Amino acid sequence: MCGIVGAISAVRLKRNVVPILIEGLKKLEYRGYDSAGLAIQSTNGLIRTIKRVRAVGRVAALESQSEGLTATSGIAHTRWATHGAVNTDNAHPHISERDGLSICVVHNGIIENHEDLRIALQA
């Protein structure tokens, strides 16, 4: 079963949310999953970067891959495949970048109105 975790640090605290996201994913492990991932946004002055780390298998592998990353906000996801292969391409989060803008999405299940959403977001 899929699970979603999100974290945002108060601006004045600038707390690293990566350990919070990983801990949240660990608490979801009992539900079962085949892949896990996280996307984080780091803010340095006016420069914002989004980084994505995805892994097939255990959250421990994701934790190892995310060592040293810091961020003030992020989302994380565990996936239990009902459609599509179990691989890093299908692991969440999904990121799309266009014209200097980024959007990061995690979801549970099938997005039935994906074409309508795509058209609205591209407008």
Which residues make up each language-model segment?
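N-terminal glutamine amidotransferase
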Residues: 1-123
